Amino acid sequence: MTETAGSLGLPLDMPPHVYIVIAVTILCVRVLHVALAPPPRRPMDGPPLRTMVVLGSGGHTAEMFALLRAMSPRRYAPRHYVIADTDTTSRVKAEHHEAAVGESLAESSDVDDDELSIASEYSVGTIPRAREVGQGWIHSFFTTVRAAVHAAAVVFRERPHVLLCNGPGTCVPVVAWAFVARTLRPVTWFVGVGSRPAIVYVESAARTKTMSLTGRILYTTRLADEVFVQWEGLARRYPRAKFAGRVC
């Protein structure tokens, strides 16, 4: 009579490759479940949501801060900004934005000291660029791996409830690891690093006819829960994308 493995009823003498096939099948089902499931929904009157914001440069940064100014700092707090390690401009802009947020909250009569402390909290972290302009493809492989390792550390350390990005290539490894964090949540929850971030991507207003490479990657792979575009024509071309007006 064949001996079985616990309550699963699997024979203990099965070849190792069978267990591998079973494990891979379970993982694939889990990935599909996460990719096709609706984004996490949280009540609007719930506790503050840890928010991670990936900043690019130039127009991307300007659009992101326009978007952040429309969001409640009391609801989306604390905020952790992720920038490329060679991007000093975005760090300065983040600090200026947060200084303005702090002043506005301090002047508000309905914000107590505890709420002010939480809503004003922010931090800035860096990750290496996955690829510099003009960099060769072979060298890019190693820099991409390095960026992915740093992105994983950021995501599992900060455990965001919301991940917000709008186009820079820097966001791809961060989004990928946020998706991994959701996929592995049944496991990571037990060791205290689990999170279930809602991943939101906002395409740049500069993209009027087609999505950027980053946008196409996140849209096609379904790594992003919500994809917003700023032109109605783009929403018609990409049916799962949503048009909600322009940021600025």
Give the ranges of each region predicted by the language model.
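Nucleotide-activated sugar donor-binding and catalytic core shared by glycosyltransferases
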Residues: 1-248
